[in-house]
Amino acid sequence: MSFDAKAFLATLTELPGVYRMLDIGGNVLYVGKAKNLKKRVASYFRENLSSPRIAHMVSQIASIETTATRTEAEALLLENNLIKSLAPRYNILFRDDKSYPYIVLSKGKFPRLGFFRGNPDRKADYFGPYPSSWAVRDSIHLMQKMFRLRTCEDTVFSNRSRPCLLYQIKRCSGPCVGFISADDYAADIQLAAMFLLGKQQEVTRRLTKSMEEASAKLAFEQAAVFRDQIQSLHQVQEKQFVSSSKGEDVDVLVAIKEAGQLCVNLAMVRGGRHLGDRPFFPTNAADSEPSDACAAFIRQHYAAHPAPARILSYPLPSEDEAGETEVALAELAGRPVPVQEGRGATHKAWVEMAIQNARLAILAKNQATAQQEQRLAALQDALQLPEPIARIECFDISHTMGEATVASCVVYEGNRMKKSDYRRFNIRDIQAGDDYAAMRQAVSRRYDSIAGGEGTAPDLILIDGGKGQVSSAFSALADLGLTHLPMIGVAKGEERKPGLETLIFPEGREPLQLPPQHPALHLIQEIRDEAHRFAITGHRAQRGKARKTSKLESLPGIGPARRKALVARFGGLPGVLAASIDQLAEVPGVSREMAEKIHSALH
């Protein structure tokens, strides 16, 4: 039974909202937002649709669900949440869940210059966001050189008796030991903030004036400091290929389609300074146009991140799309956020730079893909596997003398590490330090669902270990009836140096040692090292948690609320152990009698 569009449209409201198109199986094909639900949904049922991709989607529609909202901003936020959670087949999807980094200047008598990632609050001054952590750290390095601000943590700052190395190399003015007054340090902080806001000319003017005043007072050492700051500032300005004297906050967005890839590149300009860019390669975009990708990126990105004063887009979204999006962005930001093409020499230069960097990103991605495919082909050939390798899973075990044993399983798929499929296993009910039993348990728990017909089986299993670990892992597969899954162990050489690994096979096949430069070995090392990293971070967290709470959890009469209060008061088990009975009795919910019992049980 075909979808009756005419009857459905007659029931639609003209309010803003979100629509979801579903196929006959109830799968969501597409999620969209609209200023006018009735008008937007009706546009899909015109005779001449602009895109074959959209026409194919419309032919599969069995039903449409709608949600009316009060404003276009609400519709934008709801659309973004649904796209991220449902991942519809016909939506261009951008994975941009990472928060962007900022430069932060803390409050206080001697503020700290630092790196921040997260949601800014009012406890400090934030500058950014920046497209990458590298861009922030590079800017912090420049700020240290120009303004000599401290970057040490407050705990270090308050306990120093002599200046650190940064003072010796003229990257800090030494406020920790009183080598600069609070007033002079505050002046440097003000100049740094002005620089980050794009007021370089004003910073230069003030430094020049200070240098001249110091020279007039014959304070030549101080004048030399100002001179060096001015020179550093000029060097920074020379490195900035294209900057704006207007101190603008602009995002430059370009989308290009070349060499089988669609890349959306976001360049960030803050305070007139070009801070760098970040390329995105969306999924479900093979048949999409660059203008559609720009429109999708604007909706998804700025529903989750603050919008700048202006967005330059190349190419521009359609006129209707751009207009609706501008209204929604203005509601979210509380001010107009124009989406426009580059106008003027500076804006056009920014767009050209973003296009060039998008092309470089496509080239780099295709080269990386070709390299990974070469590695996979070399691995298939080296192991004499009949089928191409698409998915690899690798196991590793981590513990400290048998304490807090954790197994990791990392996944390589689609020419990259697939972190969404990673798993950790807290190993229990084995003899402490028994790596073989730990490996057997981890493999058994991971593939139990595969034996039951659920999930995705790997094309190759890597075991970080030698004959014993491989034998234990293979035994677990045998119990599950999965011995057809290819498996190898990666045994380190006697000197435990990369390139000397030996590949161990189950069931008696001769071990294999690949040359150090073999591409298959490089791939194995990359995956093995990631499994080790994932295992050891999980182990450390588990060990720290166990050491912090294990004895507290075994105390009679101490439930979760009291345990939480004790940890909050004393910072963990060591603090509780060091506390006296009187100090324990001061904790909310702990009586004198209970404090005596706790103290007695712990000592």
UniProtKB/Swiss-Prot annotation:
It comes from the Bacteria. SUPFAM superfamilies: C-terminal UvrC-binding domain of UvrB, GIY-YIG endonuclease, RuvA domain 2-like. Its main location: cytoplasm. Residues 201-236 form the UVR domain. One of its GO terms (biological process) is SOS response. GO terms for molecular function: DNA binding; excinuclease ABC activity. Gene3D superfamilies: 5' to 3' exonuclease, C-terminal subdomain, GIY-YIG endonuclease, UVR domain, UvrC, RNAse H endonuclease domain. Transmembrane segments: none annotated. It is found in: Cytoplasm. Interacts with UvrB in an incision complex. The UvrABC repair system catalyzes the recognition and processing of DNA lesions. UvrC both incises the 5' and 3' sides of the lesion. The N-terminal half is responsible for the 3' incision and the C-terminal half is responsible for the 5' incision. Belongs to the UvrC family. This is UvrABC system protein C. It comes from Dechloromonas aromatica (strain RCB).
